[in-house]
Regions:
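Hydrophobic alpha-helical transmembrane bundles of multi-pass membrane proteins
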Residues: 1-167
Length: 167
């Protein structure tokens, strides 16, 4: 029952923190950031959901909600990474946070948590490179300039998505 409580409390903390962060940063509450805040809260608590109290779970989720907001801006605006739903931030950046906060509420070691983050990150990076290379050999991933100009809807499925806007 503690895991159920903490999971929901962290999601709530993530939503509230992401909404407040977007409000303070832009003057508006961004619904997409709220959704990413909920995901961030869930991701942040997942590494160790049984140990924290309900209040600690809210704080962990809120930390995830704030982090996901700034991480999405960093990847989108600074690095120019095409991540339309903020998945890298919500799952990657906040996932690292979630693993690294476990020692605050349990007897886990920060050093071992860091080793885990590096091992998971290294494995994921190498596995992704291999899979992407294989897929690209079988079927090129990048669309040509001509395909992009024509529109991927027409080149890939033979239908124009918005015929009212075509020439």
């Amino acid at each position: 029952s503690q895991v159920f409580l903490n999971t929901n409390m962290a999601a709530a903390g993530g939503v509230i923190a992401a909404l407040l962060t977007s409000l303070f940063a832009t003057g508006k509450m961004d619904v997409t950031m709220a959704i990413n805040g909920a995901i961030a809260g869930l991701v942040a608590i997942t590494a160790g959901p049984s140990a924290p109290s309900g209040g600690e779970a809210v704080f962990i989720g809120a930390a995830g909600g704030v982090l996901v907001y700034f991480s999405i801006l960093f990847f989108d605006k600074t690095l120019k990474v095409d991540d339309p739903v903020g998945a890298i931030s919500a799952h990657g950046t906040v996932g690292i946070l979630g693993v690294m906060v476990v020692p605050f509420t349990s007897d886990a070691s920060f050093l071992w948590q860091l080793y885990g983050v590096l091992a998971i990150g290294g494995f994921t990076y190498i596995a992704s490179l291999i899979v992407t290379f294989i897929i690209n050999v079988i079927m090129p991933i990048r669309a040509t300039d001509e395909e992009q100009d024509a529109g991927l809807d027409s080149t890939e499925v033979g239908v124009s998505a918005y015929p009212e806007f075509s020439d």
